[in-house]
């Protein structure tokens, strides 16, 4: 079931070696998932139901004219058929958007934090970064194998993992 969810909607969860965790290619948002059960619990939490905001009847004022729908279909390159159904669907979508716009908004919340993260994230500091680096583990599944990359591998002159520059290359530099 989880793999099907991953293919359809979840792009930030990585499954490897029986464990699941957030994709670490960017910044981490929230705690890591340690089991499939935690992922299922997270996804099963319902904060609100879309059906509460979907209209049960169509508001006649929101139904776009036939000319407008035909023009939108032409611009979109879509076939011009089933215009009555499209008008009703567009009216429902407009009604849904209007209801979302009319919801009360907490003005004290920073809109930059309007994601699935804590509302007041702690700022990064040097000690926290050093601890994070010290506890960071390499992932074989991402190709992070210790000693697998040698930056001086193709250098003509090198010693103990360092590049050696000849004196002639340094002339004329201040």
From Swiss-Prot:
Name of the molecule in the record: Glutamyl-tRNA(Gln) amidotransferase subunit F, mitochondrial
Cross-referenced CDD domains: GatF (cd21422)
Subunit structure: Subunit of the heterotrimeric GatFAB amidotransferase (AdT) complex, composed of A, B and F subunits.
Keyword Nucleotide-binding appears in the UniProt entry: yes
Gene Ontology cellular component terms for the protein in this record: glutamyl-tRNA(Gln) amidotransferase complex; mitochondrial inner membrane
Keyword hit for Glycosyltransferase: no
GO molecular function: ATP binding; glutaminyl-tRNA synthase (glutamine-hydrolyzing) activity
Organism, as annotated: Kluyveromyces lactis (strain ATCC 8585 / CBS 2359 / DSM 70799 / NBRC 1267 / NRRL Y-1140 / WM37) (Yeast)
Source organism superkingdom: Eukaryota
Reactions mediated catalytically: L-glutamyl-tRNA(Gln) + L-glutamine + ATP + H2O = L-glutaminyl-tRNA(Gln) + L-glutamate + ADP + phosphate + H(+)
